[in-house]
Amino acid sequence: YTKSKLPNFWKDRDDGRSMIKTASYEFFDEKELRSISNTDVGEILDSENKMERAIELAKDYGKNYKRIIDGIKKKVEFPPPLVVKDSKGKLYLLGGNSRLMLGVAMGYNLPVKVISWSKKIQ
């Protein structure tokens, strides 16, 4: 799915690692969070019981939600969610959906790494 949205995003594995390492950290406001595609964070923001819904989705994805919640509470260093920002300002979550939605459900504004892309997300 991601390959169809981001065709030829990385030339090879080393290119990908380099882009991730050099990406900047940002804190998104609610409007930006809602505008990210390929994530459930908008649904979490709209949910009356944010935590319950985030846990339900994390379970559906086979994620160890207890470890993520515990890690967020204890301020364990996790890899940040990765977001691609294209030439038009469109945002696409490349990885970290469970961390992002559980963090939002807990009331945290987690930093995300933003990779700028000169092309357009499909």
Task: List PLM regions with ranges.
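N-terminal extension/subdomain marker
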Residues: Y1-G16
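Serine/threonine-rich, low-complexity intrinsically disordered segments
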Residues: S4, T22-S24
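Short, well-structured hydrophobic secondary-structure segments
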Residues: D12-D15, S24-N38
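Short alpha-helix boundary/capping and kink motifs at helix termini
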Residues: I36-L94
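Glycine-centered loop/turn positions within well-structured domains
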Residues: P79, L100-M101, L110
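A sequence-level detector for short glycine-anchored, His/Arg-bearing signature motifs
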Residues: K90-M106
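Amphipathic, charge-rich alpha-helical segments that serve as recognition/docking helices
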Residues: S116-Q122
